[in-house]
Amino acid sequence: MFIVLLPAFLPAAAQWKWHNPMEASFPVIQNQGFTKEIGNSYTRLPERAKGVVSEPVWNLSQHSAGLAIHFYSNAPQIKVRYTVTGSLNMPHMPSTGVSGVDLYSINSDGEWHFCFGNYSFKDTITYTYNNIGKDRYHKQGFEYRLYLPLYNGVKWLEIGIPEDAKLEFIPVSPEKPIVLYGTSIAQGACASRPAMAWGTILQRSLDYPLINLGFSGNGKLAKEVLQFIGEMDARLYILDCMPNLPNQKEEDVTALAIAAVKQLREKHSAPILLIEHGGYSNMYMDSIKYNEITQVNRASRKAYEQIQSEGIKDVYYLSREDLNIPSDGWVDYVHPSDFGMKQQAIVVERKVREILHIPLGSLTTTIPVTQRREPHMYEWQARHRAFLEQVRNHPPKAVILGNSITHYWGGEPEHRNKNGRETWEKVMRPAGFQNLGCGWDRIENVLWRIYHGELDGYKAGKVVLMIGTNNCGLNNDKEIVEGLRFLLSAIRQRQPEASVKVIGILPRRNQEQWVRNINFDIKEMVETEGYEFANPGTALLLQDGKIDESLFIGDGLHPNNRGYELIAGEIASSNKSY
């Protein structure tokens, strides 16, 4: 009887399909660096570093700390299976931190959620994520971020989904990374799971690539390691090596820190953040430990002051007092718990936001966030990547930021929906406009895109902003106006010489009065802040104040080509001088 039944079980086992990131047609290992050399591996330094960096650093570079895999899937169940190169755990750090993985989902409104997986640590480690729900907007699932082990190497890894589900890997981010060079603490000791390492908490908060070059016991500001760091074009370099330098002479530590900054500055002008030793859990009860902390941080401070006195610009500093790791923030004498990791990440994030001019507001319209509300029409992240490539290869002299009204108007990147192609070609293209519109964007989504490079690396003569209608019904008028004010500040920071024009919210069916009222408030704010306001949408109204349905595609929101003809001239016209 068992012989008869056995084949009946085989199809169930075969109903899974497995995806190997190494077999993707493009690099998919995020937060890695040196992608052209090691993008088909789970390591952190290229092969040519072997014999150049110290043997311990080389061995530790084979650990996958900070690496991640991003993908889309609509699967109701996801499995991850893989093998590792070393021991599963350490006395002070569990298997879930040393050798585990972490999975987060991101829904269509950009909200992150931790996914708990049932795990099994055997020769092949497995994580199983069950009963996955559906997105509120569509049936194409979620974006996922899979974070890899902190203190182990990955031999091979596969992601499994039911055979009737879909999985699509996301290419490596083209954005400039933050590069973190540090010690065991930076590598992730002693987080309970990979995403709780402070560098990864920072990465998740900022949503920039962050390359983790933490090397346990070997974060010593070595010029050989800095040589490879200098090959990476980063938006910020963080040096957090003081915890591995307490046993060196004070003057030597000062010299090392100064030399490290100068070595990086020879190749790059990006900001550099120096971080002091965060302290020991027992430093107030152990006089030797207290003296170690005092000495190494005094040396670090001397280095920073010397750097400042020499006029080396864009070097920043965080002290032990700034970090303020609480007494319950350690697992042992020096390695933070999740509590300590979170504290350090919060403090560093606050400083990084100041350095990179990426503030957070208190309203939802002032907190940058991604979206994926209509993947059946386009992939938002893919369009963002296309924008970055477009402005890099063809620096525009004018840009228009907006939502679907802009997105489906015309221009590049190409899209099958073009509601006003003729008008775009007649008016906007001759005026030099690059279309930076994304369907279903809200104010906070445009803020994310600005923080992530769409206005960087070129000088535009004009910036036109046409956003806010999708915040209707979700935010009150004050939140919308303040969100626009916040957004305009971000635009001015990145395009200080451009003239900036804000287009009033276009009229929409059954909400014409609300549009009139809020445009009055928007106009007042815009002109007070010194920008130009235009309200071409009045041309889309009948004499009774209702929209002219013949000028829209049928939804009472998106203009057709005739509608665009009536508003394009005022949108594209030259702005007043700022």
Regions found by a protein language model. Give the residues of each.
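Serine-esterase "nucleophile elbow" of acetyl-processing enzymes
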Residues: 14, 92-94, 134-138, 142-216, ...
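Catalytic cores of extracellular degradative/oxidative enzymes
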Residues: 206, 210-317, 327, 332, ...
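Bacterial Sec-dependent N-terminal signal peptides
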Residues: 1-16
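Structural recognition of the beta-strand scaffold that forms the well-ordered cores
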Residues: 177-180, 209-213, 236-240, 271-276, ...
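Extended, charged alpha/beta regions that create polyanion-binding interfaces
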Residues: 58-170, 375-377
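Oxyanion-hole/transition-state-stabilizing segment in secreted/luminal serine hydrolases
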Residues: 194, 202, 219-258, 263-266, ...
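Catalytic His-Asp segment of secreted/periplasmic serine-dependent ester chemistry enzymes
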Residues: 278-365, 509-578
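Glycan-recognition and processing domains
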Residues: 15-62
